[in-house]
Design a protein with these regions (language model features):
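Short, surface-exposed acidic-centric catalytic microdomains
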Residues: 21-62
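Divalent-metal-activated hydrolytic enzyme cores
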Residues: 43, 53-78, 82, 113-141, ...
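His/Asp/Glu-rich mid-to-C-terminal helical/loop segments that flank catalytic regions of hydrolases
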Residues: 364-396
Length: 396
């Protein structure tokens, strides 16, 4: 995978004061990917050292009063060309910088105060559709024994649990909030495994319960709350779906957004929630752009076809009618299923980083679709899904 990274984060002395800002998590990522080092400020020809620069009223000023907007724009376009000419889809830039800041930058008073805004290079990269994050994102998603990655698996995908080098197993009946009388459906197992996959700490849940079985939204999302309680900050959902013809085709995909059509919401059951600060959760970028970009990069490297699109969560358990499929198509939906939607809402309420992978096992509403045929289709893509998940975990 190709990644552009701010040179200062890799330890190069290119900052205005002649120093660097090396970040261990970024350096570890750089060891696993094909890196293009960028620094728009030095690319512009600005000297090192120099006075600090900040944006103010749409211009970039040095602390000595010099207007260096044109220099920053020139350097940003040089860096942009280095990124686009190499077909790079991910850039890791220095937070708060007037050239590389993402969502917030210094306000131009040189007092350390931050305001909403983007660096000059960041704006250009975003316009090109490139995923831009700062070192804070890389540090936040880095797994550890204290912060393992959670994987919640759906029909026919529980085989991923076999990859785990186990340390401990947890019966679902011992998980707070999970229905003790529940029995796993075919293709599911109700025993979580704590351990590692290729050395990466994980907690794998190879089965779940659903609303259509009569369980509440709180019970359906109890595994997410349990993962959060165990310290998980990153969570990967993998489940079988139907592909909405015209918007998606069968095979592996990554979910970019969702529509909750289940008729309920776990945050509406406020009295039973643990660890959630507010039910009024921002669902913009509910599916981490960074994790999605990693998944696409891994898929490209491994030559795995990986589509993407919007997911619609329905109540089920019946498969979709032709009229429902037509409606979903008009909504811009690519994938439809009976899980994931509520779990993603809960994960975001708990401030977890979400990646949702899907196996579109059948065309939505197709004649002859059965639970068994979905399981059989899952087996067809089992190897590619395994390679994809292992590849993503390896980059965290």
């Amino acid at each position: 995978m190709k990644v552009a990274i701010s040179a200062c984060l890799l330890g190069l002395p290119v900052r205005y004061d002649g120093g660097a800002k090396p970040v261990s998590a970024v350096q570890k990522l750089a060891e696993k990917v094909n890196v293009t080092k960028i620094c728009p400020e030095t690319s512009s020809g600005l000297p090192v050292p120099r006075p600090p620069a900040e944006q103010r009223e749409g211009r970039v000023w040095l602390k000595d009063g010099s207007d260096v907007t044109d220099d920053f724009e020139r350097g940003s376009k040089i860096a942009l060309n280095a990124v686009t000419s190499s077909d790079i889809t991910l850039a890791v830039l220095k937070a708060k910088s007037p050239s590389c800041g993402v969502h917030e930058i210094y306000d131009g008073t040189y007092s350390g105060k931050l305001v909403s805004g983007e660096g000059t290079l960041t704006r250009h990269l975003l316009e090109e559709g490139i995923c831009v994050v700062t070192e804070k994102t890389i540090e936040n998603v880095r797994p550890s024994v204290e912060h393992p990655v959670a994987l919640i698996l759906g029909t026919g995908l529980g085989h991923l649990a076999d990859l785990v080098k186990p340390v401990r197993r947890i019966d679902y009946r011992d998980i707070p909030g999970f229905p003790v009388d529940a029995s796993p459906m075919a293709g599911h197992s109700f025993e979580a495994t704590i351990g590692t996959i290729d050395g990466v700490p994980v907690v794998v849940y190879p089965g779940r319960v659903h609303l259509y079985q009569g369980y509440s939204a709180a019970e359906v999302t109890s595994l997410v709350q349990h993962a959060h309680h165990l310290g998980c900050k990153d969570i990967i959902f993998a489940g079988a779906t139907g592909a909405v013809s015209g918007n998606a085709k069968t095979g592996l995909g990554v979910i970019t957004d969702q529509i909750n059509l289940t008729g309920t919401n776990p945050l509406a059951e406020w009295a039973g929630l643990r660890d959630v600060e507010t039910p009024f959760v921002d669902m913009n970028d509910a599916f981490s752009p960074y994790l999605r970009t990693l998944a696409r990069g891994v898929a490209d490297d491994l030559k795995i076809e990986l589509n993407e699109g919007v997911f619609a969560g329905l109540l089920g358990p019946n498969f979709e009618t032709p009229a429902e499929v037509a409606m979903l198509r008009s909504f811009g939906v690519s994938y439809v299923g009976v899980s994931t939607a509520l779990e993603v809402i809960m994960a975001r309420a708990l401030d977890m980083n979400v990646l949702a992978l899907t196996l579109a096992a059948n065309p939505a509403g197709a004649h002859g679709t059965t639970h068994k045929s979905v399981q059989e289709a899952s087996e067809k893509y089992a190897n590619d899904l395994e390679r994809l998940v292992r590849g993503v975990l390896g980059l965290l």
